[in-house]
Amino acid sequence: MPAIGAAIDNGKTEEPYWKRVFVGFEKSQQWMRETKPDVAIVVYNDHASAFSVEMIPTFALGCAAEFPPADEGWGPRPVPVAEGHPALASHIAQSCILDEFDLTICNKMEIDHGMTVPMNLLFGKIEKHGHWPCPVIPLAVNVVMYPPPTGHRCYMLGRAIRKAVESFPDDLHVVIFGTGGLSHQISGPRAGLINSKWDKNFLDNLTKDPQKLVKVPHIDYMREAGAEGIEMVMWLVMRGALDDKVDEVYRFYTVPASNTAVGHIILENRARKSAVKRKPATKHKRAAARARSAVRRSR
């Protein structure tokens, strides 16, 4: 992920090594332009920027009015400050907490490459003094320090978020990004591990049989997908927010990119296609979602 961000920031996206990666996101950027979301909920993991080893919430929701890019040791990335959506974020926090998900509420929060790079890949490169196309709501998930949440817990949180969005009084078109690694390990004896069979099976089940994925234990992610493969549970927050049956609009997968697998998938609720043909109703929330991974995390 940091290497992908550096390629964007330093104008290397057309170099042969990187071009195949960025070409794979062109259709996704087109989908985002056509979808025109009002808000994007971005599920990601923080890398000791907003939090530290002294305080790591399992789930932390950004309720601030804005989210500046974090200085990760070499200065903030040259991307715009992200606008938040405090009204929807606070509503989600209230709804989820009353549904017994104990979210940490963040009224001030910096976002690092774990969030800004996925936004670049979906929205395209935007200069520092520009504006992201829509407000965002960060949802940081602890997949850095043991114990991380289970896949089932992440999936159920997604369902709770769906319920919250549907009960919000304003009619909004909301997309949700699930980010994090496909198979990769950045250190130790298995550094450089890539398991394409595991990755592709995960993407297949994400579309067709997510209930199979929610039962996968932590040890299987680490054994089959590497130490950082546990990040894949974050995709299940996104999947839980969608209908049981979804349409797979687009999939992209390539290896390697900075010694890791990179892939993403776009999923839409089947009801969305007919819903957008009707006159918007206050209680109806148009829904679409998208999941992606850009692996190689810095610690």
What do these predicted regions represent?
Residues 38-45, 139, 172-180:
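Beta-strand elements within well-structured catalytic alpha/beta cores of enzymes
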Residues 48-52, 183-187:
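Short catalytic/ligand-binding loop motif for oxyanion handling, primarily in non-cytosolic enzymes
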Residues 158-162:
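Phosphate-rich cofactor/ligand-interacting catalytic cores and adjacent structured alpha/beta frameworks
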Residues 44-48, 112:
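Glycine-rich, aromatic-flanked loop segments that form ligand/cofactor-binding clefts
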Residues 1-38, 53-156, 167, 189-299:
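Flexible, D/E/H-enriched segments
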Residues 165-171:
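Nuclease catalytic cores that cleave nucleic-acid phosphodiester bonds
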Residues 143, 178-180, 186:
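Generic secondary-structure microfeatures
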